Structure formats: C-alpha cells, structure tokens
C-alpha cells in the first residue's frame, strides 16, 4: 500500500524594497546632529582658539631675530611652524565664530540664557580676546597700518560694550552684585581689557592703552579681593570647571605684558606682576587634589590650563630680555617648554575625545544665578504651605 506524498513548496521573496519604502534616516539625522551641536555650543569653546592664538604670539616673539635673550636653540625655530600655527588658529577661530553665529540665529534663547549665566557670561569676552591676540601675532600686518587699526577697533568695541553692561550690573543691579556672582571666570573680562591695552600700546596709542589698562586693573583688584574673601558666590563654582582657577595666573601675567608694552620696558611694576603670577602658579601646582575631580572625564574646560601658562611663558620671555641673566633665561626655557607641551597635549586629548566636544553642558544648563536654586526651593515651600 503506497502512502500518497505531499509536496510543500516554499517561496522566498528576495526582492529589495524600493528607496521610498526603505529609509535609513541618515539624511534626516544630519540636520538633527547639527542642531544638537549648535544647541550645546557655548562661548567657553573659544578657549581652544584663545590657546591657539596665544601660542602663536609666543612663537612669534621667540623666533623674532631682534630678541637678544633668545639662545641659538630658539633662534633656529622654523618660521614655517609659526605660520602654520597662526593659520590653524585663524581657521579654528573663524569656524567657531561661524557656528556661534548660527546658534545666535537658530537658538537665540540659549544665547540669552548664556548671557544671564553667572559663569557663561564671562566667556562672551573670549571671541574678542582671541581676535585681538591673533591680530597681535599676525605675520603679515604692521601695527601702524590702517587695516590693523581698523580691525583693532572692530574687536575692541565688543569688549567695551560688555564692560559697560557687566560692570554696570555689578554696581547697580541688586540681584547681580559681584559679591553674589564672583567666580574665577570673572577674570576673563579683566584679561580682555588687558589684551586690548597691549594692542593699543603696540600701535602707539598710549592714552587708549592706559584707559583700558586702568579699567582692567581696577576691576582685577576688586574681583581678586572678592574671591579672596570666599563670599557665597565663589562656593557655587562647579568642580569640573576648576581648571579655570589658572585664570588667577593669566590676569597678572597679561597685566605685566600690557604694562611692558605701554612703558616700553620691563620695569619694576611689570616685574611685580610677573612675580605675582609666578607665585600663584606655584600655589596651584602644589595643590593637585584641587583638580582631581575635574580630571576624571575630558571637558573643554581643560583648555583653561593652556592659555594662562602661555601668558606666563610670554611674561618670562619679556623678563629674560630685560634681566639678561641665567635665572631669567632658565625661567624662559622652563615656562616656554611647559606651555608648548601642555598645548600639544591638549591638542592630542581634544582629537582623541572629539566625540565628547559638543555634548550638553550641565553647568550652563543649571540656574542662571547661584541663588536661584535656593529661591526656587523657598518659593515651593511657601506654595505648599
């Protein structure tokens, strides 16, 4: 007896869906990624271009043939490296300015929040500082040229505008008193005025330079004393931003450079400011535990190590040119080497952690005022009662 066989036919459809039916979403994801990057971008990223521009200025001074204190090792530094560094700084600065301009167009509310933030508002000076340093280190322009002077005013006017707004708030606005908002980042405004003072002195505008220098130094003394007293505003400074403590080094170092350009010589005042920055640097270096929490994960705030040390290196070069002794040459060699090594290390770390660059910054996403959280809690408690 034969059992009837049943045949089973299996058909496999290998057809590929059309492009209309199958979408990867990559084309739609690109604008989303760009918008997310713009939303996360803030003025603190100009620390990168600020470091590049200050490093270019250091190299320009070190390879200058008229520098009498430069040893034969420094005199052989290739000028091509300086030109490459300057153009890299230019590309970085233009790129950051372009991206930040896009943020102002598409996310103006975020820019406004940054302006109201007690830390973020200080870094609105950073683009102007970078441009002024780039102008002073430019290899193709002389300070007496019309183009140089025009660009100087274009970059210096935003500094004066922010001075009037920010310093005016410290004096007159009850909720924006310096005693409540003071933090190490407040020294960025001081550095901006001092960099502008040096630029004016290089052009021979001594009256303008003295005006900017006096404005910067008066507010530096006020900020320094306020921070030294450890008032409530300083206690709200996030641990991840502690590299910004090196701005304590940058401010007197830049003041020394500006005064040297105004007077034409590295006199006693310039030396006093240099020694102050040197003392503060040693004080910070002797306290590595202060920066332990901030070094756990890469953050763009790490660039705050670079440009203050470059300012100190620039100061040491000017000091060595004045004293012409082994101690001055040794300080110049030490701080120039440290500055270059820190700068190169930051370049490598930034390239290795490029995927972390444009992430949401929880610091700027916090309250715009250090007292806002306490006020919010008290209001909630009142409403519950």
UniProtKB/Swiss-Prot annotation:
Entry's Gene Ontology molecular function annotations: voltage-gated monoatomic anion channel activity
Cytoplasmic side: 1-42, 103-114, 172-176, 229-243, 287-299, 352-385
Organ and tissue specificity: Expressed in the vascular systems of root.
Comp. bias (Polar residues): 376-385
Primary subcellular site in the record, as a coarse category: membrane
Topology in membrane: Multi-pass membrane protein
GO BP field: chloride transport; intracellular monoatomic ion homeostasis; positive regulation of anion channel activity; response to salt stress; response to water deprivation
Family: Belongs to the SLAC1 S-type anion channel family.
Assembly and binders: Homotrimer.
Gene Ontology CC: plasma membrane
Places the protein is found: Cell membrane
Tree of life domain: Eukaryota
Membrane topology, Extracellular segments: 66-81, 136-150, 198-207, 265, 321-330
Keyword Translocase: no
Species this chain originates from: Arabidopsis thaliana (Mouse-ear cress)
Region feature Disordered, mapped onto this chain: 366-385
Name assigned to this protein: S-type anion channel SLAH1
Keyword annotations from UniProtKB, A to Z: Cell membrane, Ion transport, Membrane, Transmembrane, Transmembrane helix, Transport
Biological role stated in the UniProt entry: Slow, weak voltage-dependent S-type anion efflux channel involved in maintenance of anion homeostasis.
Coiled-coil segments: none
Annotated CDD domains: TDT_SLAC1_like
Parts of the chain that traverse the membrane: 43-65, 82-102, 115-135, 151-171, 177-197, 208-228, 244-264, 266-286, 300-320, 331-351
């Amino acid at each position: 007896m034969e059992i009837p066989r049943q045949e089973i036919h299996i058909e496999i459809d290998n057809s590929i869906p059309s492009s209309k039916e199958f979408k990867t979403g990559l084309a739609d994801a690109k604008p989303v990624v760009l918008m997310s990057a713009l939303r996360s971008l803030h003025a603190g990223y100009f620390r990168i271009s600020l470091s590049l521009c200050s490093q270019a200025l250091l190299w320009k001074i070190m390879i200058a043939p008229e520098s009498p204190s430069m040893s034969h090792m420094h005199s052989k530094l290739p000028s091509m490296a300086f030109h490459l560094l300057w153009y890299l700084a230019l590309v970085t600065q233009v790129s950051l300015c372009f991206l930040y301009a896009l943020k102002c167009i598409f996310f103006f509310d975020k820019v406004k929040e940054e302006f109201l933030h007690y830390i973020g508002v200080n870094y609105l000076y950073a683009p102007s500082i970078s441009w002024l340093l780039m102008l002073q280190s430019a290899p193709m322009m002389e300070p007496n040229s019309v183009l140089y002077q025009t660009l100087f005013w274009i970059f210096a006017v935003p500094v004066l505008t922010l001075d009037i707004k920010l310093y005016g708030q410290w004096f007159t606005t009850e909720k924006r008193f310096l005693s409540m908002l003071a933090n190490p980042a407040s020294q960025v405004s001081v550095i901006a005025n001092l960099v502008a003072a040096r630029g004016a002195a290089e052009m021979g505008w001594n009256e303008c330079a003295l005006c900017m220098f006096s404005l910067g130094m008066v507010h530096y003394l006020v900020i320094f004393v306020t921070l030294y007293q450890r008032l409530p505003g300083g206690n709200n400074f996030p641990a991840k931003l502690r590299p910004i403590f090196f701005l304590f080094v940058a401010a007197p170092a830049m003041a020394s450079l500006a005064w040297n350009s105004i007077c034409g010589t590295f006199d006693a005042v310039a030396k006093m400011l240099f020694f102050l920055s040197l003392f503060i640097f040693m004080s910070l270096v002797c306290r590595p535990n202060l920066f332990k929490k901030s070094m756990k994960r890469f953050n763009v705030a790490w660039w705050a190590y670079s440009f203050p040390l470059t300012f100190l290196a620039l100061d040491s070069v000017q000091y060595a040119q004045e004293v012409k002794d082994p101690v001055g040459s040794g300080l110049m060699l030490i701080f120039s080497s440290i500055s270059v090594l820190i700068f190169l290390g930051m370049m490598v770390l930034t390239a290795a952690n490029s995927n972390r660059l444009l992430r949401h910054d929880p610091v700027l996403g916090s309250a715009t005022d250090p007292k806002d959280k306490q006020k919010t809690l008290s209001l909630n408690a009142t409403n519950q009662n």
